From Swiss-Prot:
Description of how the protein assembles with itself and partners: Homodimer.
Name assigned to this protein: UPF0210 protein APJL_1516
Transmembrane feature ranges: none
CDD domains cross-referenced by the UniProt entry: RNR_PFL_like_DUF711 (cd08025)
Family: Belongs to the UPF0210 family.
Superkingdom field: Bacteria
Length: 451
């Protein structure tokens, strides 16, 4: 396939002027062969495997970035859910394993490591419960370890005992980490995927290879500029512009993924098409929606605009790569998106509207700061609502919520870097405590029976 000079110039512009980057190259690593009944032996095995397989990742990313002139922002590791790997130890805490993950990730120079996780959509094993109860201390005593809990699925329903425990875990983490920052590294999922390269929800699924390369691209700024410079008048034409631009973005990610796999001698897994914003001006998903004709993200019509965007990105990306996977859509993390921050500060973008938007976008309620006085059962209720959307619609949904101790509505919290800052958003005054405390399981919906 010949490449026109105009296409080369277009790619250079995407990088130089529109904040285009490859957001992450993530190596997924299977840890089943590290299992030992001795937790010290387990920790030693985990450290050795991660540092052996991941030792060249950062250098490879630098070489590829220099070769193609494409910024590769993060290099990350995901591992098999630790609740599965640590079960044989019968330990009453897995904090030491989190600390081992932290040391291993720092030793090879990656930015985050995910997989301090438990999959409890249908029930909790003793190991799952130990892991979840270890999360607050693990987040407090590590820097770059990320944790996730899958509490529901379309096939299993929603495990409300796990939802209750997840709410309590998030609240406890907020209380013992500065400004609740530990909660920025915890995601609670429904229908979690096994090949997600993005943090904080990445883990290496049991059905994956021993090691795999997954790539996440990002180009909100590219899409916004494409829309602003197009002659699109109808929404049909808008969708076409998004689709064609997503194709171009995806081709770059595919190239980087295939090259990284070749250099590292690790199979290429998937390319995640998700539009991942940053707090930088010109790198916002909210501003794409506004470029479609909304005066501000969060006003009426926002959910429809986001649905159009998400679907068109998928269609364009699927044409460009046979390896599309992960979450693949649009992320709407409030603190990480300059346009979302502005909309939330104006009061137009509310928690309720964000919940509606999650029914049509990539993940869920992401990087939302709430008052520190928010009770655990309210957090559990928010998680249950979000999980219900995912369960009924057969899609991945998630909650990454930060109760900021000592702060209330009208104030804001600064996380720094890619995590940005967030205004404290109000939650409902009514109580769901009795509902959450009932426990049990919300049964799987009728659409789960597909065989």
């Amino acid at each position: 396939m010949s490449i026109q000079s105009s296409e080369i110039i277009e790619t250079i512009k995407m990088v130089a002027d529109q904040n285009f980057d490859v957001r992450t190259i993530t190596i997924g690593i299977d840890l089943h062969d590290c299992i030992s009944a001795d937790i010290d032996e387990l920790n030693k095995n985990i450290y050795q495997k991660i540092t052996t397989i991941g030792k060249d990742l950062v250098e490879t990313a630098k070489i590829l970035s220099a070769k193609y002139g494409i910024p590769i922002v993060n290099q990350r590791i995901s591992v098999t859910p630790i609740a599965q790997i640590a079960a044989a130890t019968k330990a009453d805490s897995y904090v030491s394993i989190a600390q081992t993950l932290d040391r291993a990730a720092k030793a090879i120079g990656v930015s985050f490591i995910g997989g301090f996780s438990a999959l409890v959509q249908k029930g909790m094993s003793p190991s799952d419960e130990v892991l979840i109860r270890s999360i607050p201390e693990a987040m407090k005593t590590t820097d770059i370890v990320c944790s996730s809990i899958n509490i529901g699925s379309t096939r299993a329903g929603i495990n409300m005992d796990a939802v209750k425990l997840a709410g309590e875990t998030i609240k406890r983490t907020a209380d013992i980490t500065p400004e609740g920052f530990g909660c920025a590294k915890i995601v609670v999922f429904c229908n979690a995927v096994e090949d997600n390269p993005f943090m904080a929800g990445a883990f290496h699924g049991s059905g994956e290879a021993d090691a795999i390369i997954n790539v996440g691209v990002s180009g909100p700024g590219v899409l916004k500029e494409a829309l602003e410079n197009s002659n699109a008048t109808t929404l049909t034409e808008v969708a076409e512009v998004v689709k064609k631009t997503a194709f171009k973005i995806t081709r770059v990610g595919e190239l980087i993924g295939q090259e990284a796999a070749k250099m590292l001698n690790i199979p290429f897994g998937i390319l995640d098409l998700s539009l991942a914003p940053t707090p930088a001006v010109g790198d916002s998903v909210a501003r794409i929606l506004e470029a479609m004709g909304l005066s501000v993200c969060g006003t009426h019509g926002t959910t429809a605009a986001l649905a159009l965007l998400n679907d068109a990105v998928k269609k364009g990306g699927m044409m460009a790569s046979s390896s599309v996977g992960g979450l693949s859509g649009a992320f709407i993390p409030v603190s990480e998106d300059e346009g979302m921050i502005a909309a939330a500060e104006s009061g137009i973008l509310t928690l309720d509207k964000l919940e509606a938007m999650t029914a049509v976008c990539s993940v869920g309620l992401d990087m939302i700061a709430v008052p520190g006085k928010t009770p655990a059962h309210t957090i559990s209720g928010i998680i249950a609502d979000e999980a219900a959307i995912g369960m009924i619609n057969s899609k991945t949904t998630a909650v990454r919520i930060i109760p900021v101790t000592g702060k209330d509505v009208g104030e804001s919290v600064e996380f720094g870097g890619l995590l940005g800052y967030a205004p404290i958003m109000p939650v409902k005054e009514g109580s769901c405590e009795v509902f959450v405390n009932r426990g049990g399981r919300i049964p799987a919906p009728v659409q789960s029976m597909k065989n």
